[in-house]
C-alpha cells in the first residue's frame, strides 16, 4: 500500500487506511514532537491531537503522497500551540 491508496481508504472510512498512515509515520512524528516539547508524555499528547486533526481534515490534503510532510507540519504546529499554552499558564 502507498500513501495515495491509504488516504483514499481512510477518506472512505476504512480502518486499514488509517492504520497504514499511523503505523508508517508514528515513530518519526513522535520524535519531531519530542524535539519541540522535550517531554515524552506531552509528545504523545501532541501526536494524539495531531493525528485527530489530520484524519478529520484529509479532504484538505491535495497530494496524498505528501501525507508525511503535511502531518509533520500539523505536529509542529500542534506542539508550538502546546508550548504557547504552557507559557501563558506559567505567566499567571
List each model region and its residues:
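Intrinsic, short, N-terminal disordered tails of RNA polymerase sigma-factor systems
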Residues: 1-5
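Arg/Lys-rich amphipathic alpha helix in sigma70-family domain 2
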Residues: 59-63, 76-92
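A short, charge-rich alpha-helical start-of-domain segment used by transcription regulators
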Residues: 7-31
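A short, glycine- and basic residue-enriched loop/turn
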Residues: 15, 40, 44, 58-64, ...
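Structural recognition of an alpha-helix C-terminal capping motif at a helix-to-coil junction
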Residues: 31, 45-52, 56, 65-77
Amino acid at each position: 500500500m502507498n500513501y495515495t491508496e491509504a488516504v483514499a481508504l481512510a477518506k472512505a472510512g476504512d480502518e486499514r487506511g488509517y492504520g497504514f498512515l499511523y503505523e508508517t509515520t508514528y515513530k518519526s512524528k513522535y520524535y519531531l514532537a519530542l524535539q519541540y516539547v522535550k517531554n515524552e508524555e506531552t509528545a504523545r499528547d501532541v501526536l494524539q491531537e495531531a493525528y485527530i486533526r489530520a484524519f478529520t481534515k484529509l479532504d484538505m490534503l491535495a497530494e496524498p503522497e505528501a501525507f508525511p510532510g503535511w502531518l509533520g507540519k500539523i505536529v509542529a504546529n500542534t506542539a508550538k500551540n502546546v508550548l504557547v499554552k504552557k507559557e501563558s499558564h506559567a505567566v499567571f
